[in-house]
Swiss-Prot record:
Entry's localization field: Cytoplasm
Species of origin: Desulfotalea psychrophila (strain LSv54 / DSM 12343)
Protein name: UvrABC system protein C
A molecular function GO annotation: excinuclease ABC activity
CDD domains with a match to the protein in the record: GIY-YIG_UvrC_Cho
Family: Belongs to the UvrC family.
UVR domain boundaries: 203-238
Domain GIY-YIG, chain residue ranges per copy: 14-93
NAD listed as a keyword: no
Length: 607
């Protein structure tokens, strides 16, 4: 019996394009591309409900199909990648590695650039390198940069002149442009060398340092020549510690691909100047499509203008639409791109290394699952729960005398933080300092939606003792969910007594040893809810402070406040922003930028 309605094809042309499948709630659940939309969609009408696979499950949920016609198949591929990133459809391949990897940013848009670690890219003039899967490797790189090319690390885009250099200058960790100790020409030469290093062009950097050393020697400037010599030695020592991948000096990305059941692990080795400089891994669970399709979609999602491909990509097998994919990736780079499926030689060793790393992902996943099974069993037994708590949620209320009140809900699944289910709730109905009332409001909103969507947790952790737990149980009784999940209160008592765990219907608290894995896990969840709440609460306070200060400036309304925050960030960053940076914000012209800059600088000097 066909499930895909043929009426969808009536208005569909025989042209290339993209199709979006929507469910009953008008949510995009799948995005696909086609050289011929009619032929591609017709293939779904032939699919029978008697087949038991992911396609069957998906097609049963399809209520509507939208199509977007493109001129070429390449345009369809570009649009498909863009729409997948935008909608994150349930049945497409979404690259997730559950980690917020750091980047190294070089603020080349500033007059005197800085080098720093950041957690996310901003749409500014900075150059970003990464992400670094190993924080240790990233900090080692920053340490090397600071020792070889010591740029300023003071805060603020604008350099503030000083009469005396800072401590970093005195210990040789800063060139001290603030005191006029270095010319901008020499400073920017150091920036260029840092960019070469971060781009993986270590051979080019060594050649440049040797050239400058010889020039300094010819000028009889032996002190400067000695400095270049020391930089060369330090750089060579660092490079010798890296794994030599091959006898060449190529830049390559090497893909490893391993499937186990309905899960795929992908590992990407980064080879720069013939050295393995790092890697990144992804899990793709319950995927839709053949291995060649999965690999093709993984590659098209991974690369973009912010993450351009290197000169060479090595793959374990041929992806779907090989030529089209090559053409698509070529748009993201200025050099000639080669995509190879090696059959012999050193390149096959690299691909096997990437495959081995992908297999290791499964081993680590199995180890985590075994660890959680043991911990989950202990939690159930120690707390006398009705079920193993695969999902645990915890709520924290943050406010200062009732101001900027929010509820922060965190969720842990299978022993790990499930950040896709973290939520902030702005308090709507309670005024003044009423923690119980705020708690009731947030819980009602969370559980009413949870009942409707069928996603209640197995265990709910209340941050507090008997009083807070009693309030939670009152809400549970009103909603009829007292037995749908387990409930625990965790209260920090006097220091010598430690943490106490409270259960509904039990008079005395459960006392666990301070080193108990069960207690430590519950404390970790509770502390994460505090951190999540405090971070957002601080952001709200900053916005309120910004609003009050900007309200005094003529020409600034709510829309421009939002634009300033979106473009620049916090109040602190807006206060530190240069005139040029303020003018880059949409709707802020030169006159208004000067007015904002003058006003905020005056307020800052007063404080």
């Amino acid at each position: 019996m066909p499930m895909f309605p043929e009426k969808i094809l009536q208005s569909t042309p025989h042209k290339p394009g993209v199709y979006l499948m929507l469910d009953a709630k008008a949510r995009v659940i799948y995005v696909g591309k086609a050289k011929d939309l009619v032929k591609r969609l017709t293939s779904y009408t032939r699919h029978s409900s008697s087949e038991h696979n992911k396609t069957t499950v998906m097609l049963k949920k399809v209520e509507q199909v939208k199509t977007i016609i493109t001129t070429t198949e390449k345009e369809a591929l570009i649009l498909e990648a863009s729409l997948i990133k935008k909608h994150k459809p349930r049945y497409n391949i979404i690259l997730r590695d559950d980690k917020n990897y750091p980047y190294i940013a070089v603020t080349v848009g500033e007059e005197w650039p800085r080098v720093m670690m950041v957690r996310r890219k901003r749409r500014d003039n900075s150059r970003y390198f990464g992400p670094y899967s190993s924080a240790t490797a990233m900090w080692a790189t920053l340490k090397l940069i600071a020792s070889l090319f010591p740029l300023r690390n003071c805060r603020g885009e604008k350099l503030r002149p000083r009469t005396r250099p800072c401590l970093n200058r005195q210990i040789g960790k800063c060139l001290a442009p603030c005191t006029g100790n270095v010319s901008r020409k020499i400073y920017m030469e150091n920036v260029d060398k840092i960019l070469l290093l971060l781009q993986g062009k270590s051979r080019d950097l060594l050649a440049e340092l040797k050239r400058q050393m010889l020039q300094a020697s010819e000028r009889l400037n032996f002190e400067q020549a000695g400095q270049f010599r020391d930089q060369i030695r330090a750089l060579k020592t660092t490079l010798e510690k890296q794994l030599v991948a091959a006898g060449h000096g190529k830049n390559q990305d090497v893909f490893g691909y391993v499937r186990s059941g309905t899960t795929v692990a992908v590992n990407i080795l980064f080879v720069r100047d013939g050295l393995v400089s790092g890697s990144r891994s992804f899990f793709i669970e319950d995927y839709f499509g053949l291995d060649s399709q999965v690999l093709s979609q993984t590659i098209s999602q991974y690369y973009d203008r912010e993450t351009p491909p290197p000169k060479e990509i090595l793959l374990p097998f041929s992806p779907e639409n090989f030529e089209l994919l090559s053409e698509y990736l070529a748009d993201f780079t200025t050099h000639i791109l080669q995509i190879k499926i090696p059959q012999r030689g050193d390149s096959t060793i690299l691909v096997e290394m990437a495959n081995t790393n992908a297999r290791q992902l499964f081993a680590e996943k199995e180890k985590k699952e075994r660890s959680w099974q043991s911990l989950g069993k202990s939690i159930k037994e120690k707390l006398q729960l009705s079920r193993t708590p695969e999902t645990i949620e915890c709520l924290d209320i943050s406010n200062i005398s009732g101001q900027h009140a929010i509820g922060s809900l965190v969720c842990f699944s299978g022993g790990e933080a499930n950040k896709s289910r973290f939520r902030h709730y702005k308090i709507r109905t309670i005024e003044g300092p009423d923690d119980y009332g705020m708690m009731r409001e947030v819980m009602e909103r969370r559980f009413k939606r949870g009942i409707k969507e069928g996603n209640l947790p197995n265990l709910f952790v209340v941050d507090g003792g008997k009083g807070q737990l009693g309030m939670a149980m009152a809400v549970a009784r009103e909603l009829g969910i007292t037995n749908e999940l387990d409930w625990i209160g965790i209260a920090k008592e006097r220091h010598e007594e430690g943490e106490k765990l409270y259960k509904p219907g039990r008079k005395n608290p459960i006392l666990l040893p301070a080193h108990s894995p069960v207690l430590l896990y519950l404390m970790r969840i509770r502390d994460e809810s505090h951190r999540y709440g405090i971070t957002f609460h601080r952001k709200l306070r900053n916005r309120a402070t910004l609003s009050s200060e900007l309200d005094e400036i003529e020409g600034i309304g709510d829309n421009r406040k939002k634009l300033l925050l979106k473009k620049i960030g916090s109040l602190k960053k807006i206060k530190e922003a240069s005139l040029q940076k303020l003018q880059e914000v949409e709707g802020i012209g030169p006159l208004l930028a000067k007015k904002i800059y003058t006003s905020l600088q005056r307020d800052k000097n007063k404080s």
